């Protein structure tokens, strides 16, 4: 018998599929598999399947479920991909990505590297990922995410879960040719979700998507504070 959280999760995810936000089976299966209630502070567990951002401390939020779905669909990760995430937060998006690139890969080759600038949030994410069994497929790094993580570059996919004034140049350099980067870009109040594909050594194609609102991406190649 499914728990209340499992029933609520299925209700929300099925609704997002019905209205066309979730389009692919891989994203549908991943969102059904990851328990969002394990990635929010205890006082917000009962609200885990309200499709809204929730506070996770330090002025940061866990994205609304529909936004995680939109960004994951746009990123289009494949089983076996090596993914870089900028802005770990509570670890929820990283777990969704790990479901696709590692757990949906028969050989478990895929991996997610995720960079968080706030040490306490990185520790929170690690504990959440350990408790839910994803830490094997996710490496959490504390640092300036606007610089990427060159140690494991190039990446098949890069996803940024905070808003930048422009696409950070280090992230473009760390993207594999044929790879894709998804990032919200704009001012501090409203952004446009960009999808950047690297089609050559020095050539990128950018697609402009929906309007969105994210917390600012702080760092050397982002907002300064």
Swiss-Prot record:
Segment forming the signal sequence: none
SUPFAM superfamilies in the cross-refs: S-adenosyl-L-methionine-dependent methyltransferases
Enzyme class, UniProt record, top EC level: transferase
Pfam families recorded: PCMT
Enzyme Commission number(s) from the entry: 2.1.1.77
Keyword Signal found: no
CDD domains associated with the record: AdoMet_MTases
GO MF entries: protein-L-isoaspartate (D-aspartate) O-methyltransferase activity
One BP annotation, GO: methylation
Domain of life: Archaea
GO CC aspect terms: cytoplasm
InterPro entries for this protein: PCMT, SAM-dependent_MTases_sf
Residues forming the catalytic site: 63
Keywords tagged on the record: Cytoplasm, Methyltransferase, S-adenosyl-L-methionine, Transferase
Catalytic activity entry: [protein]-L-isoaspartate + S-adenosyl-L-methionine = [protein]-L-isoaspartate alpha-methyl ester + S-adenosyl-L-homocysteine
Localization, UniProt: Cytoplasm
Family of this protein: Belongs to the methyltransferase superfamily. L-isoaspartyl/D-aspartyl protein methyltransferase family.
Role this protein plays: Catalyzes the methyl esterification of L-isoaspartyl residues in peptides and proteins that result from spontaneous decomposition of normal L-aspartyl and L-asparaginyl residues. It plays a role in the repair and/or degradation of damaged proteins.
NCBIfam families, per database record: pimt (TIGR00080), PRK00312.1 (NF001453), PRK13942.1 (NF010549)
UniProt-recorded name of the protein: Protein-L-isoaspartate O-methyltransferase
Source organism (scientific name): Staphylothermus marinus (strain ATCC 43588 / DSM 3639 / JCM 9404 / F1)
Gene: pcm
């Amino acid at each position: 018998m499914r728990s209340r959280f499992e029933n609520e999760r299925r209700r929300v995810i099925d609704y997002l599929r019905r209205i066309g936000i979730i389009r692919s089976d891989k994203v549908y299966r991943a969102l059904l598999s990851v328990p969002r209630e394990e990635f929010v502070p205890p006082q917000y567990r009962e609200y885990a399947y309200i499709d809204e951002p929730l506070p996770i401390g330090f002025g940061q939020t866990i994205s609304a479920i529909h936004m995680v779905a939109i960004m994951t669909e746009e990123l289009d990760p494949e089983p076996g991909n090596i993914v870089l995430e900028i802005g770990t937060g509570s670890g929820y998006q990283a777990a969704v990505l790990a479901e696709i690139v590692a757990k949906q890969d028969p050989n478990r080759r895929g991996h997610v590297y995720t960079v968080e600038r706030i040490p306490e949030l990185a520790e929170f994410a690690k504990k959440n990922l350990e408790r839910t069994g994803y830490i094997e497929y996710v490496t959490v790094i504390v640092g300036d995410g606007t610089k990427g993580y060159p140690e494991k570059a190039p990446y098949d996919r890069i996803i940024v879960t905070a808003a930048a004034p422009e696409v950070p140049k280090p992230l473009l350099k760390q993207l594999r040719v044929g790879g894709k980067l998804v990032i919200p870009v704009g001012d501090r109040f409203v952004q446009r979700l960009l999808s950047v594909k690297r089609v050559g050594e020095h050539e990128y194609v950018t697609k402009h998507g929906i309007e969105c609102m994210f917390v600012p991406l702080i760092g050397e190649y982002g907002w300064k504070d």
